[in-house]
């Protein structure tokens, strides 16, 4: 049997985690996750599951009609009785709350918007399938986002960063010992990230077989599992080739 890729391994891990999360929700929620499975990634469904956990915990704590029953005992027809006001109270609750570990949790506009968007999808599934008569989530206005300026490194800052990785002048003697062993690898990683703009998670999922030197591109998987090719220049190519050449000379220790 062929070994699994990084993405296949992560997908299996996510499926196991998702099944555990669904068991903690009301039984009817399983239908929702089956319904959206063909159109979503496991990571997206896990995010939905976490968001629903917060919502049902809110109902259990703050709604007098549901306070005497467990989250797993909440019925779909009870959700049908909620109003827009209940959702507005939930949005207020999300700004500042305590989680199950009695830790303070705060949400900004983006976090609140994501959780409400999850509920809109959740309610829409049951409304579209005629299992509830009301869809108050569709009437809730999402919070206005205040866009944050994206901070980028300028050309000089990029050069300084790569020089520091290559030279390691400011490292301690102990750090320099590690630096000598990992410098070429670290330089390849940073040059790839800076030269292509891929996410760290996308870089983590790369295999050597995903690199196409002939066409100057790497195969990555975007959010939702979409496969795309990102192209790179000669500087990235040189850094990758230097590392792969060094890698071929490394003799792994037994058990690695």
Protein language model regions, located:
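Conserved catalytic core of the tyrosine transesterase superfamily
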Residues: 1-256
């Amino acid at each position: 049997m062929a070994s699994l890729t990084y993405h296949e391994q992560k997908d299996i891990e996510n499926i196991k985690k998702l099944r555990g999360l669904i068991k903690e929700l009301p039984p009817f929620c399983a239908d929702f996750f089956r319904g959206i499975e063909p159109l979503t990634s496991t990571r997206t469904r896990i995010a939905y599951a976490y968001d629903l956990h917060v919502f049902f915990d809110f109902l259990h704590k703050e709604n007098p009609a549901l306070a005497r029953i467990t989250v797993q005992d909440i019925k779909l027809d009870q959700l049908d009785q909620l109003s827009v006001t209940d959702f507005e109270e939930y949005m207020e609750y999300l700004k500042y709350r305590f989680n199950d570990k009695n830790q303070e949790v705060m949400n900004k506009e983006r976090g609140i918007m994501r959780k409400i968007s999850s509920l809109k999808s959740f309610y829409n599934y049951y409304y579209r399938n005629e299992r509830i008569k009301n869809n108050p989530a569709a009437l809730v206005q999402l919070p206005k986002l205040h866009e944050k300026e994206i901070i980028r490194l300028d050309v000089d800052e990029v050069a300084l960063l790569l020089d520091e990785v290559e030279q390691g002048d400011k490292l301690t003697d102990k750090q320099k010992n590690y630096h000598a062993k990992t410098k070429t690898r670290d330089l390849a990683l940073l040059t790839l990230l800076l030269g292509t703009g891929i996410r760290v998670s996308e870089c983590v999922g790369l295999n050597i077989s995903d690199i196409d030197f002939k066409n100057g591109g790497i195969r990555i998987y975007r959010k939702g599992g979409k496969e795309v090719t990102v192209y790179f220049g000669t500087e990235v190519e040189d850094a990758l080739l230097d590392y792969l050449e060094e890698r071929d000379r490394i003799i792994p220790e037994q058990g690695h």
